[in-house]
Every structure is written in C-alpha cells, then in structure tokens.
Amino acid sequence: MKQEIITLNAERNVTLTAYIQETEGEFLFTKRPAILVLPGGGYAMCSDREADPVAFAFMKAGYQAFILRYSTGKHRAWPNPLEDYEQAMELIKEKADVWLLDADRIAAVGFSAGGHLCACAATIAKNKPAAAILVYPAILKDICDMCQPGMPYPHEHVTAATSPCFLVAARDDRTVDIKNSLMMQLALAENGVPFESHIYSFGGHGFSTAEDHIINSSVSDRVPNWVADSIGWLKEMMGSLTAKGFTEPNMAVCLNGDSAPILSVACTLNHIRKQSDEVQVIMKPLYDGMEAVAAARGYSVDGLSAAVGGNTVRELLEMLQVNETIIQDIDKVLHGMINKIG
C-alpha cells in the first residue's frame, strides 16, 4: 500500500490523503473502486475519527481510499468546501490510471457537515459521485445556517439526476435532528432516485464506524452494521470487485421510466396522466380496463387510479391481461413522444 498527501490549497489548508492498494500480480484485476471520505466537524474542523477509520474499513473491502480535509474554520465560507470537493474529484479521475482505480466507480461518504458536503456533491456538483453515503448528514436550514449561513439545503436540490444515496442516522441524534435524514429520504423518493436508509433506534451523533475504540457513548449493537451494509449496497449500485474484476451492477438505477427523455410503458400511471391529450388517447385500452375493474368491484375510478398510480403502465396492462402485442404497440407509439418532466 502507498500513501500520498496532496496539498490542494495551501492557504486554506486543504489536503487530499490517498491510500493506494496494489493491483495485478497476485491480484487478477487491474483497477479497484474508490471511496472519497468527507469527515464531519461542523465546518469548524475535520474529525480524525471520521477519517482514517472510515478509509480503512472501505480499503478492507478492496477500495482505494481518499480523505479530503476540506476548507473549515475561517475558510469555510461557501462555496469553498464544494470547490475543494470538485478539485479532489477531478484529481482522482485524472490520476485514475496511476492510482489504479475505475473512474466510473468513485463513491463518496460524508459525516455530519461532511454529510452535507456529500449531499451537495450528489445533487449540485459538476463531478457527482457514482453513489453517496450520507451518515447523520446536515440537510435542513436550521443546522446548515448554524454551520455557515448561505449554504444550500441539499434536499431542495434533489432531481432525477441526483446520485444514488445510502442514508445512516440514529433516532436519538440531538445534534442533527433525524428530520434531516427523513427529509432527504423523502426528496429522493419523490424524484425516483435510488436510495437505502438505515435509522437506528439509538446511537446519538458522531458514532463514525461505531467501533469500541472510537465511540464514547452508548449505541445500538446494530449501528456498526452500516459499514458492511453500505459496502453491500455499493456492490448493487456499481458492481462487485471480484478476483477477476468487476461484476455488473445488480440493481436497476431507475425504478421506472418517468425520468427518461421519451415516454414508454415503463412510465408510471401518475406520470402518464400529466402528459398531453394525445397521450391520453393512446392510453384508452388502459383506462377502459380500469373503469371495468372499478365498476366490477364497486370502486370509484378516481380512487382506483390513486391507489395504483405508482404502478407502471406495463404492470397495469399486464394485470388487466392485455395482450403482449397490444402492450408492445402502445410502447412503440409512446416512444415517439417527448417526455414532459415536471
């Protein structure tokens, strides 16, 4: 293993620590995935407890690990920290071959204030991570304004283009209220962004990897599981590193076609209903079938539509036992129409 410490901004004391593991030789692969660690500290400092221990946990899983000690203290004015992130991510991608990593498989993990920075990276950065792990992240106005007035509130910037997110928090966090994670989770759900969330019964704030030598308070015995769970989730999102290289991701990034540039039977009923009158005419076989079901079961058509609105057009047509040929014909017509998003 090699370690490098690169100064990104001497005036603001911004550094990037790189931990680079070997490839080839006894290993049968040439590139590893990478993780960029963003420690917390209220934008006043970067916590050591959320730096090396986190990097080492991901290195054990095969990752090249990087720790960004971004602008804090008197240099924390926004957008300095985000600019530090952009510079670090650009450097990691630029040196991907030298640092033996896959530039398309760089994730980021952030804690507290670093979780805020990580959430901003996932939502508004030019160089978004392939996936973002947000551990007790600062998201909402009260906590963000306390750390640094003028910073963005990440949940307000979530779109379909936001990086997939893994959220970790404890219900009894009295530093960053659990509503921060819940509101971020809701924004991700509303925009169709893949996510996984683990809210533990107790653990407070600042538990990092929750190993005994790191924490100084009581946490649920299950809190340390977030590390292995997040690594497992990254395998689903980016593919797994095996002795022979990477496997393909085994989770679809998009749950439906609502964010695609053109319409299809993969779009949800709720989304299709927002489209043009021309689209509604094409949906006549679906609407007729739903009216028949509503009449047979004593439901209102509006009530049935609301209940199944999250299902895709294909799922509903199949439930109505519409012939596959007709489904494909509808799909072909929809493919000729622009998706009006928003």
Place the predicted regions along the sequence by residue.
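N-terminal cap/lid segment of alpha/beta-hydrolase-fold proteins
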Residues: 1-30, 82
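Short beta-strand element of the alpha/beta-hydrolase
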Residues: 31-40
